[in-house]
Amino acid sequence: MPIITLPDGTKKIFEQVVSVEQVAKSMGLVKAALAGEVDGELVSTSFLIKTDANLTIITANDDQGLEIIRHSTAHLLAQATQMLYPDAQVTIGPVIDNGFYYDFAYKNGFLEGDLIKIEKNMHKLVKQNLKIEKFEMSRDETLQFFKDKGEYYKVKIIESISTDQILSLYKQGDFIDLCRGPHVPSTAKLKNFKLMKLAGAYWRGDSSNEMLQRVYGTAWGNEQDLKVYLHKLEEVARRDHRKIGKTQDLFHIQEETPGMVFWHAKGWILYQLVEQYMRGIFRDNGYQEVHTPQLIDKSLWEKSGHWDKFGDVMFTTTSGDRDYAVKPMNCPAHIQIYNQGLKSYRNLPLRLAEFGSCHRNEPSGTLHGIMRVRNFVQDDGHIFCTPEQIQDEVSTFIDLTFNVYKYFGFEKINIKLSTRPKKRVGSDEVWDKSEIALVEALNAKNIVWELQEGEGAFYGPKIEFILKDCLDRQWQCGTLQVDFSMPKRLGAQFIDENSVKKTPVILHRAIMGSLERFLGILIEHYEGAYPCWLSPIQAVIINISEKHAKFIVDIVKKLKKQGLRVISDLRNEKVSFKIREHSLQRYPYILVVGDREMEKGQVSVRQRGGKDLGAMSVGTFIKKVNQETLLKNQIK
């Protein structure tokens, strides 16, 4: 006679063994039930409860329910695929953010058109309302089962499992797959999905293994959520920085230099605007800007510990009998500057900053426009300080970071604090001081932050700053990392007030992280419609006829002299054609000059979006732009 306790404390008494589905039916939830959580363990609705237990019915409204839907849909994908392509071997199909994927080994290869066929077949299976049943077999029985089916990859997975294990499998129709589960009770629960794309993937993620084909999909608990997600993807595609970068002639990347950016003139203006703003931030907040070499002898990277941890992503070269690495980060070089001359405690905190160009040999499959590259510039800074100075420095940096993000239009910031891992260097006393300093600095700001216990680096705790863009996508940009290890490894010292040599703490800090990535985020956040102060071109001036050309040339000179970023279009084309063309470039202003404007020494001003501001003098227009522009006269 099991007594079932529900989340609200209600108790249900049953005369005999009862399934999760039967309990759900007694609650009027049988149609919504996808699975159950019995005493903290997720189980299928067919699971039998034999003794008293705590039970939560899992539905599509729960995060766990959504994950079960997605995992079950991955299996639906595998079933539908093998029905159409019997030679396709199944491998794995996990849940990922917003969806799932399944990897297949198929020598003929899938085409984009095949996804349409597979998706149609999946919908057919949904309509058939196939019951999804769990059963168990011994490891050896399961191994033989998949050997008989000729499923090479499933065999490989099972061979890695100890022989005494009992394995769970799920059956829907004629399709059987290895899985821990749980799954939804029937395919009818899997109505709201879409297959998204094909990609390549190595078996077990190892590039030395064979390449498989990965099919990505998304699945949701209801049709509306699916529509909202697909609409968001359309928004993302429309804002894709790669597309906008090409349309606005900002940058390109080519085959001969994968992961390295060719900045075009307008893109370089945008880059410089951001860099020069950050240079002012450095200057106004007590940082000394430095510059360090690109090539550094391998021996320094060995001393710093980077060779062991990052050697596989370093670009290297040999000259004579010496091995060099192109720097993947700037910190060891900054310590070399610090080490030039003995420092006193009176010199601390010492803040060094650099727009450091770094190279990392990232896998080609991870490269993505200017968001993920092999050559990037960091707004990198290192603060050399005492343990007692950590809190004040962290507090100042938090304010600085929030101000920078707000300046560029990002108001939603999440913060995560990662604390000591099991394997670490430094005494517990130093870790205590550092973590307390970070916690107190965060709490003093009265901001919400998330604790990630044990997620810090081996050399110190860290704070991560994650900004949200206009689509609520999260981007981890800023970091502040406490480091007890590297200054000691590289011999950084200072003389304390008692004339004793001590090792400083280093605070590694960056606000944007990679300038390239931050610019990609900006491009997508604004969809190429930058505020006037950030726009590479603030205005384009067009003539109605050829006789207005000289007047426009003089206006351009005058505007540029005042620090405005302007261009002219004097082509012998219709005004409407030129306005339409430049509107697509999303410049803040289009200025039109005809007979009336030339006679009065004015320009007719159209604001981005088509709003007509009427005619005004050149001086009035300059004042208007200067009022909007926070970075005027930076680039001329």
Swiss-Prot record:
Residues 240-531 are annotated as: Catalytic. Binds 1 zinc ion per subunit. Keywords: Aminoacyl-tRNA synthetase, ATP-binding, Cytoplasm, Ligase, Metal-binding, Nucleotide-binding, Protein biosynthesis, RNA-binding, tRNA-binding, Zinc. It catalyses: tRNA(Thr) + L-threonine + ATP = L-threonyl-tRNA(Thr) + AMP + diphosphate + H(+). Residues 1-59 form the TGS domain. SMART domains: tRNA_SAD. Its cofactor is Zn(2+). Its EC number is 6.1.1.3. Zn(2+) binds at residues 331, 382, 508. Pfam families: HGTP_anticodon, tRNA-synt_2b, tRNA_SAD. It is found in: Cytoplasm. GO terms for molecular function: ATP binding; metal ion binding; threonine-tRNA ligase activity; tRNA binding. Belongs to the class-II aminoacyl-tRNA synthetase family. Catalyzes the attachment of threonine to tRNA(Thr) in a two-step reaction: L-threonine is first activated by ATP to form Thr-AMP and then transferred to the acceptor end of tRNA(Thr). Also edits incorrectly charged L-seryl-tRNA(Thr). Homodimer. This is Threonine--tRNA ligase. It comes from Vesicomyosocius okutanii subsp. Calyptogena okutanii (strain HA). The lineage of its organism: Bacteria, Pseudomonadati, Pseudomonadota, Gammaproteobacteria, Candidatus Pseudothioglobaceae.
